[in-house]
């Protein structure tokens, strides 16, 4: 695309408002393209797929089911699809909402959260570091009602030309092999979810 970019780090819940008020031009933050979000913004074609992964302390008996989390503390990123999912699926859980995944992870390490739920890539990273050494993955989901069409770049609805340019750039890196090269360098599995075809 040959465009100069400047990155802004924002709290998750401030991303869509920042886009809609022209503080940023795109959201490139592993945001799922969901019907709810499409009510206020547009998305590029998906560029990867990332299911949600449940993580618990090793040896814990907590299960990611409505009955399994009854009365238990589930930690999620506030205003995320993971928050929406556990709010709908686990009505009897004590849902703790955090402004960052790092805060949620720290609460689990401190024993204040029984079950974490976040995207698989983030949780895999947590499990591979010292802070996650006493934790284990206990299940994943990619329920399309909550996870939508995949991870895409968010743009304002009226920015059709920018969306088309971004789609062309995504298509080019998939066709020229750059996407696969990055995938293979950083991930142990194919994150494309079929988006590289």
Give the role of each language-model region.
Residues 83-98, 134-137, 168-197:
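Ligand-binding clefts/hinges and TM-proximal coupling segments of bilobed small-molecule sensing domains
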Residues 2-68, 141-146:
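Acidic, polar ligand-binding/catalytic clefts
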Residues 2-4, 10, 20-29, 73, ...:
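Alpha-to-beta junction loops
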Residues 1, 60, 72-73, 78-80, ...:
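Extended ligand-binding regions for polar small-molecule ligands
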Residues 1-9, 87-99, 112:
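A local structural motif
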Residues 48-56, 128-167, 187-197:
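Periplasmic-binding protein-like
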Residues 14, 31-39, 85-88, 114-147, ...:
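A ligand-binding cleft/hinge motif common to bilobed small-molecule-binding domains
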Residues 32, 53-105, 120-122:
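Bilobed "Venus flytrap"/periplasmic-binding protein-like clamshell domains
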């Amino acid at each position: 695309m040959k465009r100069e970019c400047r990155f802004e780090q924002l709290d998750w819940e401030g991303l869509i408002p920042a886009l809609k008020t022209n503080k940023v031009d795109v959201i490139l933050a592993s945001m799922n393209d969901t019907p709810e979000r499409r009510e206020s913004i547009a998305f590029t074609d998906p560029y990867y797929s990332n299911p949600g992964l449940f993580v618990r302390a090793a040896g814990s008996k907590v299960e990611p089911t409505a009955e399994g989390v009854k009365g238990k503390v589930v930690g999620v990123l506030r205003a995320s699809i993971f928050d929406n999912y556990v709010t709908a699926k686990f009505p009897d859980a004590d849902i703790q909402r955090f402004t960052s995944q790092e805060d949620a992870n720290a609460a689990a390490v401190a024993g204040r959260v029984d079950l974490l739920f976040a995207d698989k890539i983030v949780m895999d990273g947590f499990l591979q570091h010292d802070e996650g050494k006493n934790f284990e993955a206990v299940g994943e989901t990619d329920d399309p009602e909550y996870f939508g069409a995949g991870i895409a770049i968010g743009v304002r609805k009226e920015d059709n030309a920018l969306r088309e340019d971004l789609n062309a750039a995504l298509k080019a890196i998939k066709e020229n092999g750059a996407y696969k090269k990055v995938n293979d360098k950083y991930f142990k599995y194919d994150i494309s979810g079929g988006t590289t075809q």
